[in-house]
Amino acid sequence: MAHKKGVGSSRNGRDSNPKMRGVKRFGGEHVRAGNIIVRQCGTKIKPGENVGVGRDWTLYALVDGVVQFGHYSRTQKMVSVIPVTAAETAH
């Protein structure tokens, strides 16, 4: 077995592309239907009311409204969208 590394080989040089995951709309922010709220791997944050789940566990708004984060259980979080009526948005 060789005790010297062969010339011309490199063990480094690999790096994956960034996936741009994370929270995209924070609590209290207004969202339109279809806006992405969270990009995640797995159900780290659970969908609440008026929130849909994409194929890759992306959470998105189903209605126009305001984002609200809360607790799903003692250890898990949940995100909901509280609908806003047209009269409230006029102010």
Swiss-Prot record:
HAMAP family cross-referenced by the UniProt entry: Ribosomal_bL27
Q: Which PANTHER family match?
A: LARGE RIBOSOMAL SUBUNIT PROTEIN BL27M (PTHR15893:SF0), RIBOSOMAL PROTEIN L27 (PTHR15893)
Record family assignment: Belongs to the bacterial ribosomal protein bL27 family.
Q: Where is this region: Disordered?
A: 1-26
Q: What is this protein called?
A: Large ribosomal subunit protein bL27
Q: Name one Pfam family in it.
A: Ribosomal_L27
Q: Which GO terms describe its biological process?
A: translation
- Gene Ontology MF, one: structural constituent of ribosome
Keyword Transport assigned to the entry: answer is: no
Instruction: List the record's Gene Ontology CC terms alphabetically.
Output: cytosolic large ribosomal subunit
| Keywords, ordered alphabetically | Ribonucleoprotein, Ribosomal protein
Q: Which organism is it from?
A: Chloroflexus aurantiacus (strain ATCC 29366 / DSM 635 / J-10-fl)
